[in-house]
Amino acid sequence: MMFKPADKIQDLQFFGEFGGVNPSISDSSTYTFLSAKSMFDTFEGNTDGCYLYSRHSSPSNLYLSAALAQMENTEAANVTASGMGAITAVLMQLCKKGDHIITSRTIYGGTYAFLKNFLPEYGMGVDFVDITNLDKIKSLIKPNTKVIYLETVSNPLLEVADVAAISEIGKTNNIKVVVDNTFSPLSVTPANLGADVVIHSLTKYINGSSDTVGGVICGTADFINDLKNVNNGACMLFGSTMDSMRSASILKNMRTLHLRMKQHSANALYLAKAFNEIGIKTVYPGLESHPSHEIYKSMYNNEYGFGGMLTIDVGTLEKANAVMELMQERNVGYLAVSLGFYKTLFSAPGTSTSSEIPADEQLEMGLSNGLIRFSIGLDNDIERTFELIKSCLKDLNVI
């Protein structure tokens, strides 16, 4: 039976304290007990439904965590204060000094910096690889390899990982496969493809209004409980705790995620095809020319399409900057990082979201100075948007 993540979200039923249709927001950092013994039992983990301190958990955070676990079809989830809060906690929970990680050569700049610069200082080895090359992944496996870390669709080059095949490699070698699914919520369900842990930056599509920073870790109940353990849990001890007000806001926005993802994807596919037709070098997983188009099709929940991210290459950084500035001036969208907003966002990743990656490594992986990354918005008239963008390209002699 086909998995329908939007149905899982629709079927959530949380009541407010006084019968409200939205669950009540717990606006407290600490909680009272009727007896000292109840407090002791709660600290020991022997009671259900009791709260101690909001760094441990709060009702609002548990509501959102439950919703995200349903969406990703995992046993449990835990929300964090940012996407990086989720990524760092997972890797530090799974790995220790002397362990080894295999990861994609093209990943979000903050993740790259953590893996490249931070973890080696704590005695962990990291190898970066073309994540689409399964033989290369296998060749890098060592006896101490504990994690294969990847993004479903890589940032910013939009390389598509074969999550099912990589998960099989992980299981064969007793290696945990961790997937950042930020670019493809609803569209791809990594846990159904064998991934052990699924991460999102909630800041992006899931929240969708660029007014909140947050993250989530989805996995087995045992793993989530380990992360929240008061003695050695990375989420508990690192303290990347989401505010209850923000949890409540994101939970409400999740109710429209299925509508938004369909529109983001439809608009992006239209623009990708239109850019192709006028001779602009375009990368989008929904184009048949994308080297991993068929792999994406084999993984996706097709009603949500191929996502809202695409790139074009205009040749040089100077041209890229000029195009973006003119697009902002003509109200195509905003010259800004991040993604998943209702307006189109665009940036030159080599000097922004991937600037942590050294220039020589950017060149080696194919991240050119002229690359513009688009997060396509919810525009009602995407043909009008294309004409605006085309006018910018024409006026700057890009086409």
Stretches with model-predicted labels:
Residues 1-58, 66, 372:
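N-terminal "arm"/small-domain region of PLP-dependent enzymes with the aminotransferase-like
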Residues 6-14, 76-283, 297:
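Conserved PLP-enzyme active-site core in the AAT-like
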Residues 35-85, 110-117:
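Conserved N-terminal alpha-helix of the aminotransferase class I/II PLP-enzyme fold
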Residues 40-47, 325-327, 389-391:
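Short Gly/aromatic-enriched secondary-structure transition segments
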Residues 116, 125, 139, 146, ...:
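PLP-dependent enzyme catalytic core of the Aspartate aminotransferase-like
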Residues 235, 327-339, 391-399:
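A common structural junction motif
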Residues 250-259, 307-315, 373-377:
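Short, well-ordered beta-strand elements within core beta-sheets of diverse protein domains
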Residues 269-343, 357-363:
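Conserved small-domain helix->loop->beta segment predominantly found in fold-type I
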